[in-house]
Structures are given as C-alpha cells and as structure tokens.
C-alpha cells in the first residue's frame, strides 16, 4: 500500500511505482486520482489489485462539467443516477488507461460512499482482453428510466463503464463479524468525546453497509436495472411511495430479485424490467 497525495513527494512516488512491480496499489489522493493512474497501472504486476479513491465528486457527478470533460473526458447529469454514473465514469477512465498498457480491468467493488468514489479492480496483463475494453464502455441514455448504449443520443451521461461493478464471489465473502473486527476498532481508537450511543451508531452503520453490499452483490455483478425510490412514485403515477419491503415482496412474487443498494439516496437493483417494476409499485401503494 503506497499512499499517494499531492505534494513535494509526488514525482518520487511515481518513480518508485514505475521502477518496481506491485501486486496491490491503493491510490488515495485529495481530489482527482487521474494524474496518478498511468504510473499506478504501469506499476501493477501481471496480475494485481488497484484501488482508487476520487473526492472530486462535483466533476464525476455532473455539476462541474468542464472539470469532468477535462479530467475524465465525460459528461454527467445531476439526477438520481449521478452517484452510479460517478463510479462508472471513474471505472471507464481506469479501463482506458489500463488498455494503453495492455491490461484489462475486472471489477471487484465500486461504490459512492459519503463524499467520495471508491473502486477496486483486478488488473490482468493481456493484449487480447485489453483490446476489448470498449465493449464495456457506453452512455446512460435517460429514457424510461434509462438504458445503456454504445452511442450517445438525447439526454445522456458518459462515456462510462457499462459492465459489472461488483464481483459477487468476492463481496459475498464479507461478513458483519469480520467487518466489525476490522473497522469498528478498539475503545482506544474512538474520539475522546464519543458516547456509547455514538459507538453503537458507528457499529450499526458498518453492519448496514456490509449487509447492503452482500445482498446486492449478485445483482450488481450482472446486468441489472437500478431504480431510485424517490422517482418511482411519479413514474408509476401514485401519490405514496412504496416501501422497499413491499417492492421486494412484489417482485419476488413475480419471480424477480431485488436488493437495496449502498447509495446516498434510497435505490434498489433488480433483474426485472421497468414495466414490471411499475406494476409492482402500483399494486403496492
């Protein structure tokens, strides 16, 4: 793990990475990670893990369009899908740079958490697979509610990664017990002014996050429909928003899966089509 941040040591850190192969690199700067990606990707061995954090969420989410175009060559839209767009735009940038070095990316975990984007990918050296990187690049077209296309049209965001954003086999190995052991810390790790209530709240947040990641891993590892609960009422023409529980039960009765996603806004993923989602929402009012 070679922590990277902008400062006097940046050139030195890049030189270290280029001169020695690593199996695991974590790029975690303040702001955009773009200037570090080329060196980091070159420095990964034939098979290795690259983790990237981006805090320039205004660019990735679409509110800073000139920065997005300059850094990522992409455009975003400020709406319910901007958080998912942000992770996919970052993944597309990593995939493009990796392909320049004959490497392909295989997503492990991608999420928008608080005020940053965090992605983990497995890099593999392969000219043949790297040459196919564009097969997973496209645009999110705002239709009903959206679809991915390899060409932009109408109201769109992208280009972005349109392939899987999770690896279910890996993510489903996560357990609440293990996460609490690693992330919750010891009593000496907590701020001095934290009460028992604060500590308990922190533990519950860890449990909730791991549960959502584990439950959604299977769907996010394949083609899926992402639905924003706050948009569903208007789309279905109903006044009261259906609960997540009611939607999950209704979709299950029709033979479909659904999982609550770890997003800043209430969203779920499903393998159902949009018309089925609307029918369930109307029957759940």
Task: Describe each model-derived feature in a short phrase.
Residues 15-23:
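A short acidic, Gly/Pro-enriched loop at the edge of an enzyme's catalytic core
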Residues 86-99:
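Short alpha-helix
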Residues 47-56:
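Conserved beta-strand signature within the Rossmann-like core of class I S-adenosyl-L-methionine
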Residues 37-48:
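A short glycine-rich, Lys/Arg-flanked "PGG" loop and its adjoining helix->strand segment in the class I
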Residues 1-12:
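Single conserved hydrophobic/aromatic residue that forms the stacking wall/gate
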Residues 67-80:
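Conserved Class I S-adenosyl-L-methionine
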Residues 114-119, 124-285:
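Polybasic, low-complexity RNA-engagement segments
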Residues 22-35:
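A short SAM/SAH-binding and catalytic strip from SAM-dependent methyltransferases
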């Amino acid at each position: 793990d070679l922590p990277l941040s902008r400062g006097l040591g940046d050139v030195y850190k890049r030189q270290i990475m280029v001169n020695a192969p690593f199996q695991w690199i974590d790029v975690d700067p303040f702001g955009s990670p773009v200037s570090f990606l080329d060196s980091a990707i070159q420095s990964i061995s034939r098979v290795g893990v690259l983790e990237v954090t981006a805090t320039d969420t205004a660019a990735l989410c679409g509110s800073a369009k000139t920065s997005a175009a300059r850094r990522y060559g992409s455009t975003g839209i400020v709406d319910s899908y901007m958080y998912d767009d942000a992770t996919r735009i970052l993944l597309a940038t990593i995939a493009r740079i990796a392909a320049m070095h004959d490497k392909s990316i295989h997503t492990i975990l991608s999420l928008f958490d608080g005020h940053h984007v965090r992605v983990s990918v497995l890099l593999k050296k392969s000219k043949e697979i790297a040459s196919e990187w564009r097969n997973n690049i496209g645009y999110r077209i705002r239709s009903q509610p959206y679809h991915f296309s390899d060409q932009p049209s109408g109201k769109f965001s992208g280009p972005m990664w349109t392939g899987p954003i999770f690896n279910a086999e890996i993510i489903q190995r996560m357990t609440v017990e293990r996460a609490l052991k690693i992330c919750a810390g010891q009593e000496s790790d907590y701020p001095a002014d934290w009460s028992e209530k604060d500590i308990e709240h922190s533990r519950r947040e860890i449990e909730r996050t791991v549960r959502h990641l584990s439950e959604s891993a299977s769907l996010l590892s394949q083609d899926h429909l992402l639905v924003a609960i706050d948009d569903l009422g208007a789309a279905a023409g109903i006044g009261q928003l259906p609960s997540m529980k009611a939607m999950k039960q209704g979709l299950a009765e029709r033979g479909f899966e659904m999982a609550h996603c770890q997003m800043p806004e209430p969203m779920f993923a499903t393998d159902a089509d949009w018309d089925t989602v609307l029918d369930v929402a109307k029957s759940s009012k």
